[in-house]
Amino acid sequence: MSSVVLKNVKKIYDKKVVIDGVDLEIKDKEFIVLVGASGCGKSTILRMIAGLEEISEGEILIGDKKVNNIHPKDRDIAFVFQSYALYPHMTVRENIAFGLKMRKVDKATIEKKVQEAAEILDLTEYLDRRPKQLSGGQRQRVALGRAIVRNPKVFLMDEPLSNLDAKLRVQMRSEIKKLHEKLQTTFIYVTHDQTEALTMGDRIVVLDKGHIQQVDTPEEIYNNPQNTFVAGFVGSPQMNFIDGELLDEKYKGLTVGIRPEKMITGGEIKKSYNVDITELLGSEKIVYFNIGNNKCSAKLPATTEIKDSIEISVNADDIYLFDKESEKRIYE
């Protein structure tokens, strides 16, 4: 069993609560993504699971075993860092084998495990090279290889793709997902990038200021956000938030949320707004405009003709309602 359970976990630094009573159950063999802005506490949670940070209150279980007071090396986890953390003077083979050598595993077993990991990660021809002779993507694969040979119960990954360029990030996203399918092990992945979260996770944990805002599948997080934070964090461009009374008196005291792709032209009920900026993004066009003091955007086909003003319409089914004070979703 490689499940991970957090029960009322808190982290306090200098009397400041950084993680505030987090409850989370991560299933065996699940790929779960912790996502949120910088400073939300996602990396702190990961480090507490790893044992690199002490927890102030609560319990962490890996499998059925409480690990609060267990040393990191005895938790049967592997940590993949943002910086790769490779030894520059060692070859790829030596870097991958390092953890096994420290555990005094016999040479034949080490060689077998290194070869297997190199095959999985397409690194066989690079085993005798040093990190400086590799690309960023190859270095990241070496870091993954060092984790694979340990055969851990749980993989912990802290922003592992943030140092790569956009093209490599896309490639490595699919490689990590394939790796998860091959290894059938629990993966806990931290990122600030909502695209990574939506494309990689079986479930997503959205965090803000040390609190879990929502835990759900990517589809549910996108289509059924529980509050304005989740609705605004996931989606590009982000959801439009409009004072309800600007649209209709019946929405007084509410915030109306509308995804940019749901702002359409040519509907039955429409209003005209002055265009601020237009951005062409290949097959799409993003049009920015204001509704009262609310900055809004519409995602339209690139062929849409845009002048000084635009007529926008919205279907009632595409409107989200939020309580203005609590910011929680209102379901009708």
Label for each model-derived stretch:
Residues 56-59, 109, 209, 319:
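Conserved coupling/switch loops of ABC nucleotide-binding domains, chiefly the family-specific signature
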Residues 237, 249-332:
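Non-catalytic connector elements of ABC transporters
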Residues 35-37:
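The feature captures the beta-strand-to-loop junction immediately N-terminal to the Walker
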Residues 70-227:
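ABC ATPase nucleotide-binding domains
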Residues 58-66:
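Conserved ABC transporter NBD signature motif
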Residues 50:
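Helix-to-loop junction immediately C-terminal to a conserved catalytic motif
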Residues 22-33:
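Pre-Walker A (P-loop) beta-loop-beta motif of ABC nucleotide-binding domains
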